[in-house]
A protein has these predicted regions:
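Helical hairpin unit composed of two closely spaced alpha helices linked by a short loop
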Residues: 285-330
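Pre-Walker A segment
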Residues: 118-175
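Extended, charged alpha-helical coiled-coil/arm scaffolds that mediate oligomerization and mechanical coupling
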Residues: 54-114, 118-125
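Conserved glycine(s) of the Walker
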Residues: 186
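Noncatalytic partner-interaction/assembly domains of nucleic-acid and motor enzyme complexes
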Residues: 1-82
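The conserved Walker
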Residues: 183
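C-terminal regions of RecA-like/P-loop NTPase motor modules
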Residues: 273-285, 314-324, 335-420
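Cytosolic-facing regulatory segments adjacent to core modules
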Residues: 166, 189, 197-284, 298, ...
Length: 420
């Protein structure tokens, strides 16, 4: 338990750091640790002179109070370590304020916040910047055990789309999921459907950064989707009697969820990250949605759009990793696909595709044949094309599309598994 709370770096003195490392190693090997065994360990590692040899170890053992209060002592060490980190970070922030160099003020604020947030996050989790392979293997094995015990189920955040969740095992922490489509294909709708299900099912917080639509517009979409209410009637207010009970039900469900909407336009990566960190600190953040990537801006970098998109893409992946949550980033597609016979999107259709393709863990495209062919036999159907999946399979998932409800739904299957 103490090993979960402390690391050797939490000790100020070098000799105490070494003693804690030695105790940790002996403990992991289920070997006893006292002045004699520790002295032998330091002798075998040629480190005895750095800790004062056996005499100092004996002195420590004799002057140490009872082990009954060991956790309280460990918490004191941890608290002092946090205070030293704050002093160090505070000094760095002050130095940056005096000599900012070429960095803009928003960037300095973001860096300062990140440094303080890292200390707070490490204080909660006890996690350090660097872990040994042994520690990483232990975490991997524990995760494998969980996956083994939940075989056939979703290990990440569920989206509510059965076939998609089966292929991806849900939205995984630290993954950047890029969802791209031509206008009117339903990319905002699909992202909101995933967000609403994740929030209602997992009870985690979901934050949607909407740089295209207002918060009230998204709220109406969510009400339409949850309540199965015609979006057109919601827009005009011409509701039927049965619609009101559905509106009430949908609003009750949504008001009890932890969905947050930020509709500030043209967010910078630094500002978006700052807002997401705040939600992470105050709530159990489970998912971030960005609508959409090309509407973000990087201050002072407007001359080269490709470079700007590259920086935005990298920042979103870094955010997913830092916050340990999946990030769904919506993206535009080039108009070029409209001139092709087969208008199903491919990787090269991503606008400023190079960096996005590289940074994304999953790339999804939406294709609805009825949009291009009015006599299509696939009316009401949508293809969600998993074009890239860094840690799993690619393929196509078919969903029902209900435009009037701003909603996608699972396709029903018959007894032999084919789609009805």
């Amino acid at each position: 338990k103490i090993l979960d709370l402390l690391s050797y770096t939490d000790f100020y003195r070098r000799d105490h750091q070494l003693i804690f490392k030695a105790i940790s190693e002996l403990s992991e090997k289920s070997r006893p640790y006292d002045a004699v065994t520790l002295g032998d360990w330091f002798e075998s590692h040629a480190l005895a002179d750095q800790v004062g040899g056996t005499p100092y170890l004996v002195e420590l053992a004799q002057t140490t109070p009872s082990a009954a209060n060991i956790r309280a002592y460990a918490e004191i060490v941890r608290d002092k370590s946090v205070l030293r980190s704050l002093i160090e970070v505070g000094t760095q922030i002050a130095e940056d304020g005096v000599a900012p160099g070429n960095r803009e003020t928003p960037d300095l604020l973001a860096e300062a916040e990140q440094r303080v947030f890292k200390i707070a996050d490490q204080n909660r989790s006890g996690r350090k910047d660097m872990v040994s392979l042994k520690e990483a293997m232990k975490e991997a094995f524990e995760l494998l055990q969980v996956r083994y015990e939940t075989q056939g189920t979703v290990t990440g955040l569920p989206t509510g789309f059965t076939d998609f969740d089966e292929m991806t095992a849900g939205l995984q922490p630290s993954d950047l999921i890029v969802l791209a489509a031509r206008p009117a294909m339903g990319k905002t709708t699909l992202a909101l459907n995933m967000a609403e299900y994740a929030a209602l099912k997992s009870k985690k917080a979901v934050v949607v950064f909407s740089m295209e639509m207002s918060a009230s517009q998204l709220a109406f979409r969510l009400i339409s989707s949850i309540g199965r209410i015609n979006a057109g009637r919601l827009k005009t207010g011409q509701l039927e009697d049965e619609d009101w009970s559905r509106v009430t039900m949908a609003m009750k469900m949504l008001s009890e969820s932890k969905i947050f909407i930020d509709d500030e336009p043209a967010l910078s990566p630094a500002k978006l990250l700052s807002k997401a960190r705040r939600i992470k600190r105050e709530h159990d953040l489970g998912l971030v949605v960005v609508d959409y990537l090309q509407l973000m801006q990087v201050p002072g970098n407007s001359e080269n759009r490709a470079t700007e998109i590259s920086e935005i893409s990298r920042s979103l992946k870094a955010m997913a990793k830092e916050l340990s949550v999946p990030v769904i980033a919506l993206s535009q597609l080039n108009r070029g696909l409209e001139s092709r016979t087969d208008k199903r999107p491919v990787m090269s259709d991503l606008r400023e595709s190079g960096a996005i393709e590289q940074d994304a863990d999953i790339i999804l495209f939406i294709y609805r044949d009825e949009y291009y062919h009015k006599d299509s036999t696939d009316k009401g159907l949508a293809e969600v094309i998993i074009s890239k999946h860094r840690n799993g399979a690619t393929g196509t998932v078919k969903l029902k599309f209900f435009g009037e409800y701003t909603r996608f739904d699972n396709l029903a299957r018959d007894a032999v598994g084919s789609f009805e």
